[in-house]
């Protein structure tokens, strides 16, 4: 782990108290529509408006994940096959994070971004399932 990555971890962990607040809402899903020239309501595909702290998280985590492949196997993986590709994003259960290594957390964060690219709201779902917080707590455990 180099100094740049440790600084990236510190910057991510600065956000953890906000994410742990019981009142924290990672995103809202406003109605998206417009009224056309004929007065007809036109619905839009929904997408979230993320909390500013989530947007900051999305700006900060790339400094930590640079250089990790999202699907290749890591030596510490349970199987030699790596992560199965999924257009909707790969996800893990809560137990995964209790033992995850730094590279497994880095890969998870990389996959968060990939999941969001192909599925608006993926990051919201991972926050609501408390997986992002679990990943950050594991980082804190390993590096603080």
Provide a role label for each language-model segment:
Residues 3, 20-30, 41, 73, ...:
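Charged, low-complexity interaction regions
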Residues 73-82:
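Low-complexity, small/polar and acidic-rich linker and loop segments
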Residues 38-40, 81-82, 89:
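Intrinsic-disorder/low-complexity loop/linker signature
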Residues 125-143:
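Short, charge-rich amphipathic interface segments used for partner binding and complex assembly
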Residues 2-9, 85-103:
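Short, charge/polar-rich alpha-helical segments
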Residues 7, 14, 66, 94, ...:
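Intrinsic-disorder-driven secretion/translocation and chaperone-binding regions of pathogen effectors
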Residues 2-66, 72:
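Short terminal alpha-helical segments
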């Amino acid at each position: 782990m180099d100094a740049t990555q440790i600084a990236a971890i510190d910057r991510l962990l600065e956000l953890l108290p906000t994410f742990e607040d019981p009142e924290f809402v990672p995103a809202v899903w406003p109605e998206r529509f417009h009224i056309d020239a004929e007065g007809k309501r036109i619905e839009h595909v929904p997408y979230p408006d993320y909390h500013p702290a989530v947007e900051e998280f999305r700006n900060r985590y790339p400094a930590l994940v640079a250089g990790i492949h999202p699907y290749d196997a890591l030596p510490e993986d349970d199987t030699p096959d790596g992560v199965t590709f999924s257009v909707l994003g790969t996800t893990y259960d809560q137990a995964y994070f209790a033992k995850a290594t730094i590279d497994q957390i880095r890969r998870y964060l990389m996959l968060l971004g990939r999941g969001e690219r192909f599925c608006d709201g993926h990051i919201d779902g991972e926050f609501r399932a408390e997986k992002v917080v679990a990943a950050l707590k594991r980082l804190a455990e390993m590096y603080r």
